[in-house]
Amino acid sequence: MIRLIAAIDTSRGIATDKGIPWKLPGDTAYFENETTTGLIVMGWATYNEFSAPLHGRDNYVLTRDQSPLRSGFLPMTTLADLKSQPHQDVWVIGGAFLFAEAIVRADELFLTQVLEDFHCTKFFPDYHTGFVRFAQGNDQEENGVQYRFEKWRRITEPQDDPHT
Protein backbone atom coordinates (compact mmCIF):
# COMPACT_ATOMS: atom_id res chain seq x y z
CA MET A 1 0.00 0.00 0.00
CA ILE A 2 1.30 3.45 -0.90
CA ARG A 3 0.49 6.20 1.58
CA LEU A 4 1.30 9.90 1.50
CA ILE A 5 1.71 11.54 4.90
CA ALA A 6 1.80 15.32 5.29
CA ALA A 7 0.74 18.26 7.40
CA ILE A 8 -1.12 20.81 5.28
CA ASP A 9 -2.62 24.20 6.05
CA THR A 10 -6.02 25.46 4.88
CA SER A 11 -4.54 26.30 1.46
CA ARG A 12 -2.85 22.87 1.20
CA GLY A 13 0.46 24.56 2.04
CA ILE A 14 3.22 22.34 3.40
CA ALA A 15 6.17 24.74 3.73
CA THR A 16 7.60 28.17 3.05
CA ASP A 17 11.04 28.88 1.64
CA LYS A 18 12.27 28.77 5.25
CA GLY A 19 10.78 25.34 6.02
CA ILE A 20 7.69 24.14 7.86
CA PRO A 21 6.10 27.19 9.53
CA TRP A 22 4.46 25.40 12.46
CA LYS A 23 5.86 23.43 15.39
CA LEU A 24 3.46 20.66 16.40
CA PRO A 25 5.06 18.01 18.64
CA GLY A 26 1.84 15.98 18.49
CA ASP A 27 2.07 15.85 14.70
CA THR A 28 5.72 14.81 14.89
CA ALA A 29 4.80 11.97 17.26
CA TYR A 30 1.92 10.95 14.96
CA PHE A 31 4.27 10.91 11.96
CA GLU A 32 6.84 8.80 13.80
CA ASN A 33 4.21 6.35 15.06
CA GLU A 34 2.43 5.89 11.72
CA THR A 35 5.56 5.48 9.59
CA THR A 36 7.35 2.89 11.73
CA THR A 37 6.30 0.04 9.42
CA GLY A 38 7.28 -0.18 5.79
CA LEU A 39 9.68 2.07 3.98
CA ILE A 40 10.05 5.83 3.58
CA VAL A 41 10.40 7.68 0.27
CA MET A 42 11.45 11.32 0.21
CA GLY A 43 12.52 13.84 -2.38
CA TRP A 44 15.90 15.53 -2.55
CA ALA A 45 14.92 18.68 -0.65
CA THR A 46 13.35 16.64 2.16
CA TYR A 47 16.47 14.45 2.30
CA ASN A 48 18.58 17.58 2.76
CA GLU A 49 16.50 18.53 5.82
CA PHE A 50 17.39 15.27 7.61
CA SER A 51 20.72 14.92 9.39
CA ALA A 52 20.22 11.15 9.73
CA PRO A 53 17.80 8.54 8.38
CA LEU A 54 14.57 7.84 10.24
CA HIS A 55 15.31 5.06 12.70
CA GLY A 56 13.99 1.56 12.07
CA ARG A 57 12.86 2.19 8.51
CA ASP A 58 14.37 1.90 5.05
CA ASN A 59 14.90 5.49 3.89
CA TYR A 60 14.78 5.97 0.10
CA VAL A 61 15.56 9.22 -1.69
CA LEU A 62 14.05 9.82 -5.12
CA THR A 63 16.93 11.30 -7.09
CA ARG A 64 18.46 11.20 -10.53
CA ASP A 65 21.70 12.58 -9.11
CA GLN A 66 24.42 9.92 -9.07
CA SER A 67 26.20 11.45 -6.07
CA PRO A 68 26.50 9.11 -3.09
CA LEU A 69 23.92 9.58 -0.35
CA ARG A 70 24.73 9.82 3.34
CA SER A 71 24.89 6.58 5.31
CA GLY A 72 21.49 4.99 5.89
CA PHE A 73 19.81 6.49 2.82
CA LEU A 74 19.12 4.48 -0.35
CA PRO A 75 18.69 5.89 -3.88
CA MET A 76 15.53 5.42 -5.94
CA THR A 77 15.53 6.79 -9.49
CA THR A 78 11.82 6.54 -10.30
CA LEU A 79 8.56 5.91 -8.51
CA ALA A 80 8.14 2.87 -10.74
CA ASP A 81 10.75 1.28 -8.44
CA LEU A 82 7.98 1.06 -5.82
CA LYS A 83 6.59 -1.92 -7.74
CA SER A 84 9.62 -3.90 -6.57
CA GLN A 85 8.43 -3.39 -2.97
CA PRO A 86 4.92 -4.92 -3.21
CA HIS A 87 5.06 -6.62 0.18
CA GLN A 88 5.83 -3.46 2.16
CA ASP A 89 3.87 -0.38 3.03
CA VAL A 90 5.40 2.67 1.39
CA TRP A 91 5.25 6.08 3.09
CA VAL A 92 5.87 9.09 0.83
CA ILE A 93 6.90 11.95 3.13
CA GLY A 94 7.54 14.84 0.71
CA GLY A 95 8.31 17.32 -0.54
CA ALA A 96 5.91 19.08 -2.84
CA PHE A 97 7.33 17.74 -6.12
CA LEU A 98 7.31 14.15 -4.87
CA PHE A 99 3.77 14.47 -3.48
CA ALA A 100 2.58 15.76 -6.88
CA GLU A 101 4.24 12.83 -8.62
CA ALA A 102 3.18 10.15 -6.13
CA ILE A 103 -0.47 11.06 -5.56
CA VAL A 104 -1.54 9.22 -8.73
CA ARG A 105 -0.15 6.01 -7.19
CA ALA A 106 -1.37 6.58 -3.64
CA ASP A 107 -3.89 4.31 -1.94
CA GLU A 108 -4.28 6.43 1.20
CA LEU A 109 -3.45 9.89 2.53
CA PHE A 110 -2.62 10.53 6.19
CA LEU A 111 -3.09 14.27 6.56
CA THR A 112 -2.65 16.59 9.49
CA GLN A 113 -5.04 19.42 8.72
CA VAL A 114 -3.50 22.60 10.15
CA LEU A 115 -6.52 24.84 10.61
CA GLU A 116 -5.04 28.14 9.47
CA ASP A 117 -3.33 29.61 6.41
CA PHE A 118 0.43 30.03 6.82
CA HIS A 119 0.98 31.62 3.37
CA CYS A 120 3.14 28.73 2.24
CA THR A 121 5.07 28.63 -1.01
CA LYS A 122 5.08 24.82 -1.36
CA PHE A 123 1.86 22.86 -1.63
CA PHE A 124 0.28 19.42 -1.39
CA PRO A 125 -1.62 18.47 -4.57
CA ASP A 126 -5.42 18.65 -4.78
CA TYR A 127 -6.87 15.38 -3.55
CA HIS A 128 -10.59 16.01 -3.02
CA THR A 129 -11.81 14.43 -6.28
CA GLY A 130 -9.90 11.15 -5.97
CA PHE A 131 -10.13 10.39 -2.26
CA VAL A 132 -12.75 10.15 0.48
CA ARG A 133 -12.12 10.78 4.17
CA PHE A 134 -12.60 7.62 6.25
CA ALA A 135 -11.27 8.78 9.63
CA GLN A 136 -11.02 12.11 11.42
CA GLY A 137 -9.60 12.89 14.84
CA ASN A 138 -10.66 15.62 17.23
CA ASP A 139 -9.32 19.14 16.90
CA GLN A 140 -6.18 19.73 18.95
CA GLU A 141 -4.09 22.79 19.73
CA GLU A 142 -0.37 23.22 20.30
CA ASN A 143 1.68 26.41 20.27
CA GLY A 144 -1.46 28.38 19.41
CA VAL A 145 -2.12 26.29 16.27
CA GLN A 146 -5.23 24.13 15.86
CA TYR A 147 -5.02 20.92 13.87
CA ARG A 148 -6.55 17.48 13.44
CA PHE A 149 -5.57 14.15 11.92
CA GLU A 150 -7.47 12.79 8.92
CA LYS A 151 -7.17 9.64 6.83
CA TRP A 152 -8.33 9.55 3.23
CA ARG A 153 -8.78 6.50 0.94
CA ARG A 154 -8.68 6.47 -2.85
CA ILE A 155 -12.10 6.07 -4.47
CA THR A 156 -10.67 5.14 -7.87
CA GLU A 157 -7.83 2.82 -8.80
CA PRO A 158 -4.31 4.27 -8.47
CA GLN A 159 -2.71 5.02 -11.82
CA ASP A 160 0.68 4.09 -13.17
CA ASP A 161 2.12 7.37 -14.38
CA PRO A 162 3.87 6.67 -17.71
CA HIS A 163 6.24 9.59 -17.04
CA THR A 164 7.85 8.02 -13.95
What are the language-model segments listed below?
Residues 1-164:
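Enzymes that bind and transform nitrogen-containing heteroaromatic metabolites
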